[in-house]
Amino acid sequence: MTGRTLAAPVTAAQLRERIGRLPRVPLAHAPTPLEECPRFARALGTTARIFVKRDDLTGVALGGNKVRNLEFRLADALAHGADTLLLGVDILSNSARQTAAVANRHGLRCVLVLVGREPAGPPRGNLLIDRLLGAEVHYAPDVPAQQATLERLAGELAAAGRHPYVMTATPFFAQAAALAYADCTLELLGQLADLGLGAPDALYISSSGKGVAGPLLAARALGLPTRVVSVSPRDTGGAAVGAAAEVCAGAAALLGLDLGERPADHQHRDEYGPPGYGLTNPAALEAMQLLARSEGLLLDPVYTGKAVAGLIGDVRRGRVGPAEVVVYVHTGGLPLIFDHDADLLPILG
């Protein structure tokens, strides 16, 4: 915790100051642009104002939301004297790519343990970039095997005199995402203010529980009326809401914030996750095509395509009012396009 406890609501300056007390390594090209998408809105038949927060442009190995997260994660690793970063994530992970790049920038070794089967052919997408960056890549059939491999590798590295840091081994891995995206929310609020606009009526983000905790933290801390809508790349069975609340509470404790009992307006969409993680669906493909052809903005088939499909679905169901201001936080992940060329071919026209 940092200093005396502050009770919500707090000011933007107070929240920014609390975040600024935490160790952090500057990495992201921030502030990222906030772009209005009027042609996209017209294509959806709405007069709502839709903005995209371009966190696909954070820099570092094709950018994405993990660059902001890594500002806090890397600071913690360096504070622990790490010379080797170990990360256990999924085989398509954007986090793996960005972590490997950041490790190179700081002279650290990067070891990835990925859940999934090693490709029989040449690597593609994020995995190709992981290899280009020189990350040491291991594969595991499931999460228990992944954890066992991480523990074994960390032990071997320590025995060899190295200083391993298993990034996914503590709650701070998720809390760092909340801190990063509370800060990003402050950034986009400032950009909206420059346009003469207040807090958005709704904010959409791809998340299964970690990233969305940041906007939730900011909304609760500042007392914003914003609906925070997360869209998962997989069906979480409803677990994302509880996971986000837990991460939000942990991050608030680090900041010394008492958020009280007022819940943020968190809505979660699991229905765009099927047929599963790493797989796409017609709604995501439609979203990719519609945003590309109306605004020239690219989405991926696994994360951001599904998130924008959730936004499109809400507009069509009347959940977005005609006078509302909506922000979609673009979390990147564009290398995944090249894992799904066969899925994309039928919609190219």
Predicted ranges, named:
Residues 1-349:
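PLP-dependent amino-acid enzyme catalytic core
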